[in-house]
Design a protein with these regions (language model features):
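A beta-rich soluble binding module of mature secreted/lumenal proteins
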Residues: 1-159
Length: 159
């Protein structure tokens, strides 16, 4: 029998993601700080569909300040079968792949919340560099309900 604790710990994804609508540029609004993003400002991610069975991922940021030197990395995202396109594995360095789960997505694809089943990784992305404060707080509340430690969230400076 499942306990309330084990149910609360199971991370759910959205049922379906239309990758054509998802493709394009996203702005990082907030995230759990990661070593590989240290010193990043104005962080963006751009997803492009390919005919090769994966999505290209290009992450960019300005290092050390909003006007700092731009840094970027390219990778590939592979969709997990039978996930409704909501679970991907992202690879920036072969052979390593990281889980990329879409756990919340606006109906109009204006924002997305990406997490990892271990709840140590979290990103809130938007199609615009700024997000309405009320919407942001609602997202934070829902993220907390999903079992993420929201005290770790850091907002991302955007121009």
């Amino acid at each position: 029998m499942a306990t309330a604790t084990s149910i609360a710990q199971t991370l759910q994804t959205v049922p379906y993601v239309d990758l054509k609508k998802y493709a394009g540029k996203w702005y990082e609004i907030a995230s759990f700080p990661q070593l590989f993003q240290k010193g990043c400002h104005c962080t963006t991610a751009e997803y492009t569909l390919t005919d090769k069975g994966y999505v290209t991922v290009e992450n960019r940021c300005n290092k050390d300040s909003i006007n700092g030197k731009q840094s970027y990395i390219k990778g590939k995202a592979f969709v997990d079968e039978n996930s409704g396109n909501a679970k991907l594995k992202v690879q920036f360095f072969w052979p390593f792949k990281g889980k990329y789960w879409i756990i919340e997505l606006a109906d109009d694809y204006s924002y997305v919340v990406i997490g990892h089943p271990n709840k140590k990784y979290l990103w809130i992305l938007s199609r615009t560099p700024k997000m309405d404060g009320t919407l942001y707080q609602q997202i934070i509340s829902r993220t907390k309900e999903k079992g993420f430690d929201v005290s770790k969230i850091k907002t991302t400076q955007q121009k």
